[in-house]
Curated annotation (Swiss-Prot):
Gene: psbA
Job description of the protein: Photosystem II (PSII) is a light-driven water:plastoquinone oxidoreductase that uses light energy to abstract electrons from H(2)O, generating O(2) and a proton gradient subsequently used for ATP formation. It consists of a core antenna complex that captures photons, and an electron transfer chain that converts photonic excitation into a charge separation. The D1/D2 (PsbA/PsbD) reaction center heterodimer binds P680, the primary electron donor of PSII as well as several subsequent electron acceptors.
EC number: 1.10.3.9
Reactions it catalyzes: 2 a plastoquinone + 4 hnu + 2 H2O = 2 a plastoquinol + O2
Annotated residues for binding of [CaMn4O5] cluster: D170, E189, H332, E333, D342, A344
Keywords from the named record: Acetylation, Calcium, Chlorophyll, Chloroplast, Chromophore, Electron transport, Herbicide resistance, Iron, Magnesium, Manganese, Membrane, Metal-binding, Oxidoreductase, Phosphoprotein, Photosynthesis, Photosystem II, Plastid, Thylakoid, Transmembrane, Transmembrane helix, Transport
UniProt site positions, description: Tyrosine radical intermediate: Y161
Membrane topology: Multi-pass membrane protein
Family statement drawn from the similarity comment of this UniProt entry: Belongs to the reaction center PufL/M/PsbA/D family.
Organism the protein comes from: Lobularia maritima
Annotated protein name in UniProt: Photosystem II protein D1
């Protein structure tokens, strides 16, 4: 009898826990994805803060020349970063217990791998949690689909690119100047500015910003006035009201006259699908581009291929970019290479008589 009561009580406790986890009445929805998201993101955030403040220098290139990244070792907010895991570790899974000591783990950049892997798991669970809450509320799933774009971008630079290059040391540093360094080296080694998928990503981000500003300003400018001229139009609304707040017909008419008729949407759903799809698809393409360049399928390199009828080279901006890439490649990791890879790959001229 006692055993039966204990089992019922434990089942009841588990049932109450399940109901609490999946309840949409909580101030913040947790969900089953949240059970994994909360500890992983808390771990990533905590280790990031501690390492950004106090981590010792890291031997990023694996040549016994540690690079400082924390505030206590001379950096500021702009120059500071979590330095990527050492090239000596490569792609090996490197938790604390795999190192001989905590000092060795810190010297080899163990915190970077810990932060990145927990962060990627956490943001993936956040995306799943968006879908889960939408499902519980009977909503459509497109919020999580839209969020998949930044998740794909983060996965590309923190995981796919290091896998393709063979080492977590090639991942993006977790800091402002470190991000810029990553971008410059990426351009030098992969010519990303000449990659069509990066161009689509630029169009997606800049175009999305433009369309967002246009939409917000149009809606704000075409509010249906519910008040007199002597009081704010904002006073005529309450949060969550059923009635339309703005007149899409008026906005459509304004924009159609400003540019031309078919440049404007007269259907709210089509308009908002476009506002969502444009930046999301652009960022998807950029993430796909980085994931292919990770395996050295690089941007266009015309190599002085534009010639006149006599075969003479016509210099283009593409050739200027190639020269800039060589300069950037010469300067990065100066003590790890004697020559940039592009120069070292060329066969040496014969010196015989």
């Amino acid at each position: 009898m006692t055993a039966i009561l204990e089992r019922r009580e434990s089942e009841n406790l588990w049932g109450r826990f399940c109901n609490w986890i999946t309840s949409t009445e909580n101030r913040l929805y947790i969900g089953w994805f949240g059970v994994l998201m909360i500890p992983t993101l808390l771990t990533a955030t905590s280790v990031f803060i501690i390492a950004f403040i106090a981590a010792p220098p890291v031997d990023i290139d694996g040549i016994r020349e540690p690079v400082s990244g924390s505030l206590l070792y001379g950096n500021n907010i702009i120059s500071g970063a979590i330095i990527p895991t050492s090239a000596a570790i490569g792609l090996h899974f490197y938790p604390i217990w795999e190192a001989a000591s905590v000092d060795e783990w810190l010297y080899n950049g163990g915190p970077y791998e810990l932060i990145v892997l927990h962060f990627l798991l956490g943001v993936a669970c956040y995306m799943g949690r968006e879908w889960e809450l939408s499902f519980r509320l009977g909503m459509r799933p497109w919020i999580a689909v839209a969020y998949s774009a930044p998740v794909a971008a983060a996965t590309a630079v923190f995981l796919i690119y290091p896998i393709g290059q063979g080492s977590f040391s090639d991942g993006m540093p977790l800091g402002i100047s470190g991000t810029f360094n990553f971008m410059i080296v990426f351009q030098a080694e992969h010519n990303i500015l000449m990659h069509p998928f990066h161009m689509l990503g630029v169009a997606g981000v800049f175009g999305g910003s433009l369309f967002s500003a246009m939409h917000g300003s149009l809606v704000t400018s075409s509010l249906i006035r519910e008040t007199t001229e002597n009081e704010s139009a904002n006073e005529g609304y309450r949060f969550g009201q059923e009635e339309e707040t703005y007149n899409i017909v008026a906005a459509h008419g304004y924009f159609g006259r400003l540019i031309f008729q078919y440049a404007s949407f007269n259907n709210s759903r089509s308009l908002h699908f476009f506002l969502t799809a444009w930046p999301v698809v652009g960022i998807w393409f950029t993430a796909l581009g980085i994931s292919t360049m990770a395996f050295n399928l690089n941007g266009f390199n015309f190599n002085q291929s534009v010639v006149d009828s006599q075969g003479r080279v016509i210099n283009t901006w593409a050739d200027i970019i190639n020269r800039a890439n060589l300069g950037m490649e010469v300067m990065h990791e100066r003590n790890a290479h004697n020559f940039p890879l592009d120069l070292a790959a060329v066969e040496a001229p014969s010196t015989n008589g």
